[in-house]
Structures are given as structure tokens and as C-alpha cells.
């Protein structure tokens, strides 16, 4: 499971209630993490971060920032762990324009090509990733509400199909 964080485990709606910014790395909606935990436990999926949050971990998945430590702590409370991260294919131009969605699909497909044992996979992200193959595997969340029970059910079907 390729997991984005902002717009999935937090949302504009949730943050407006708390009058805080979602991208400051502090706000994770624990109810969304519980939904994610249900998905992982019922499908045995592994979590591969493909979010900008992946840059807050070293190559051994050790936290480099307090925000990453908080994410790991919240995950651990729900029995979750981060099992990997996608490679970084961003260019300087993409960094400057902040159009990271333009390379996310390539990063995911590269990760899959390097891990031949992957059977079923999904992408949970609030952004359009500009790739038809990814689109067939994507649970596209509404960034104003984040991960929902309906998203969870659709993800479960995708991961458990033969």
C-alpha cells in the first residue's frame, strides 16, 4: 500500500476545526489512522510512504524530525509500521513548482519494479497522479475529509482481489 499522508490521514475539514495547518507535520487524525489500521489488519498490507513525509526518515526508516516521531508513535499505538518509502525522482524544477504529483506515479512504479514479490497493491492519495496504470489502483481521497469508511472498503476489495 502506497500511502500519502496529507489529505489522507488529515484533512482540511479536520484542520479547520482545529484552526491549524495540516502541513506543519503535527496534525494527524487518529480516527483516520484507526481506519488505516483496520485495512492493514484485514489485508496484511505493508505501508510504503510515498508522501513528502518520507523525507523525514533516514534510509533505515529512523525519524529525522519530531513530526516523523509523532507519526511513528501514532502508528505504533494502532499496531502499524512504515515498511518502506518510494524513491525520490523529483527534479529541481518540480521542487520549485511544488508539482510533486508529476513524479509520484513514476516513483511508485519504480518501487514496484524493484520489488518483484508485490502481488496486489493500492495507492491512497488525494492527488491525481497523472498515470492510467496508477489510476486503476488508486483510492483517491477527498482532501477535505481524508480517508473514509467507503475508501477503506474499496481499498480492501482491491487488495484482496485475486
Regions found by a protein language model. Give the residues of each.
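Catalytic phosphate/metal-binding cores of nucleic-acid and nucleotide-processing enzymes, i.e., regions
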Residues: 1-162
